[in-house]
Curated annotation (Swiss-Prot):
This is Ribosomal RNA large subunit methyltransferase H. S-adenosyl-L-methionine binds at L73, G104, L123, S124, A125, L126, T127, L128. SUPFAM superfamilies: alpha/beta knot. The keyword Kinase does not apply. Its main location: cytoplasm. NCBIfam families: PRK00103.1-1, PRK00103.1-4, tRNA_RlmH_YbeA. The keyword Iron-sulfur does not apply. The gene is rlmH. InterPro entries: Alpha/beta_knot_MTases (IPR029028), RlmH-like (IPR003742), tRNA_m1G_MTases_N (IPR029026).
Length: 156
């Protein structure tokens, strides 16, 4: 199974790149973590945010291979404890499809992305900067993988 992180934003600070890549490299080949970056729309004083969200959403959905299981990362989504995420990852694996996780930009995800998602996951009730979410998701997925594979990374 491949897990795709489809995220808005292309020029992240070095610490984001370093953090994401650290967890990405830990995954085995049979559960690869891939990052697809979508260019953020230009935002300014008079920017049409609804139009920017729509365009970002179109680009995100176009980047997802047909048949992938789509999960949005969004506030109204389901809060998962780490063992629940591990169970969810097992379900994804048994489903036999690759998974695409959608991370929106500063204003979140487009309505079309939310509609296309079969599931919605909420990392926190806190507002998190979208670059940080990449690192948190990568670490959380690695932790879930470690639980499922009896790897000593996760401790109860």
């Amino acid at each position: 199974m491949k897990i795709q992180l489809v995220a808005v934003g292309t020029r992240m600070p070095d610490w984001v790149e370093t953090g994401f890549k650290e967890y990405q490299r830990r995954f085995p080949r049979d559960m690869a973590l891939e990052l697809i970056e979508i260019p953020a729309g230009k935002r300014g004083k008079n920017a049409d945010i609804a139009r920017i969200l729509q365009k970002e959403g179109e680009l995100m959905l176009a980047a997802i291979p047909k048949g992938n299981h789509i999960v949005s990362l969004d506030l109204p989504g389901k809060n998962l404890k780490t063992p629940e995420l591990a169970q969810q990852m097992n379900k994804w694996l048994l489903d036999g499809r690759d998974v695409s996780l959608l991370i929106g930009g500063p204003e979140g995800l487009s309505p079309d992305c939310k509609k296309a998602a079969a599931q919605s996951w909420c990392l926190s009730a806190l507002t998190l900067p979208h670059p940080l979410v990449r690192v948190i998701v990568a670490e959380s997925l690695y932790r879930g993988w470690s639980i499922n594979n009896n790897h000593p990374y996760h401790r109860e």
